Amino acid sequence: TSKGKNNFKNFLQFSAITNNNVSVSQKGKYGSFRTSLTHVFNKGQYPNQKLNKITYTAGGEMSYKNFKLEGSASYNKRVSSNDNGSGYSGSYIYDMVIWGGTEYDVRDYKNYWVEGKEDEQQNWYDNSWYDNPWFKANEVVDAYDTDILNVYMNSSYEITPWLKAMLRGGLDFYSKKNQWRNAKSANYAWDKNGFFGISRNSGYSINTDAMLMADKTWGKLNMNVLAGGNIYF
């Protein structure tokens, strides 16, 4: 029996997802309000694979005589310790199940540094192509930190029973920070001599509408008119 027939199974770890939420709502004579906070933690099946997701939302509506207003805001933050190891490139499944052999036991390489050459040379049977999966999980890292904000507002005023004005707008914003690094001696990463890189991307859009709507009837004659404009940035 090959001692490495269960290499992939022995590499996997216990995975779990937790989801916690708290919300508060209030309703009164002129409107209502609700706010909610959610935290999701995902511990992946691979070592050093964790995702934290926080979502906060707040929204409400109010109505007073001929005026109505509603709106909401949502903030989402996602932080991942390592997004590496999935897909085709650098996949643990391909490394250990498709391309890798079964003549070794992956558990023998859990201490992934050569003794006396820590931070310089990984402990692995292949020095030219594949990487020690424990080394790759902890020393070949693609981490990210993402922030997303969505806001919208909608207001209307009934000028007369047949004439209404409306103003609405929305904002979308995102910011993402990626961090890539690999330790020295990585065979399949960004640089075998070691690498560290950071990128930041962000963007936003604003969408605003202003409209005047008329719906008037004279006997059997009905007139429906809509006039307005839009600004998108």
Predicted segments, located by residue:
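Outer-membrane beta-barrel channels and translocator barrels
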Residues: I17, G28-K29, S63-F67, E158-T160, ...
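Predominantly transmembrane beta-strands of Gram-negative outer membrane beta-barrel pores used
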Residues: N10-L12, N19-F41, T57-S63, E70-S72
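Residues on the lipid-exposed face of transmembrane beta-strands in outer-membrane beta-barrel proteins
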Residues: A16, V22-Q26, Y56-M62, V151-Y157, ...
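An active-site-proximal structural segment forming one wall of the substrate-binding cleft
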Residues: L163
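A conditional alpha-helix N-cap/helix-loop micro-motif detector
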Residues: Q13-S15, T146
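Surface-exposed loop/interface segments of Gram-negative outer-membrane beta-barrel transport/assembly proteins
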Residues: T1-S2, G44-L51, T55-I148, M166-F233
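N-terminal entry motif of extracellular EGF-like repeats
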Residues: N6-N7
